Curated annotation (Swiss-Prot):
Residues that bind [3Fe-4S] cluster: 9, 17, 50
Database matches in PROSITE patterns: 4FE4S_FER_1 (PS00198), 4FE4S_FER_2 (PS51379)
Entry keyword Transport: yes
Protein name: Ferredoxin 7Fe
Gene3D superfamilies: 3.30.70.20
Protein keywords: 3Fe-4S, 4Fe-4S, Electron transport, Iron, Iron-sulfur, Metal-binding, Repeat, Transport
UniProt cofactor note: Binds 1 [4Fe-4S] cluster.
UniProt-annotated binding residues for [4Fe-4S] cluster: 21, 40, 43, 46
Entry's Gene Ontology molecular function annotations: 3 iron, 4 sulfur cluster binding; 4 iron, 4 sulfur cluster binding; electron transfer activity; metal ion binding
4Fe-4S ferredoxin-type domain mapped to chain residues: 2-29, 31-60
Amino acid sequence: MAYVITEPCIGTKDASCVEVCPVDCIHEGEDQYYIDPDVCIDCGACEAVCPVSAIYHEDFVPEEWKSYIQKNRDFFKK
């Protein structure tokens, strides 16, 4: 399992998460950041520093943002 960046990131794109990620698995997209699920080590460092609380462990993404799990995976299939 990995962490997922959800809707609150859109329009904010604060790079605090990128700066603290020890494995550089967070990538910038057009509208938000994305976490590479194949590289994420589940350390949670990104979740703690997100100023808009947009980052959740995949198992705990709120129901209204569950679609971001697939959106995140699809970003890395390109």
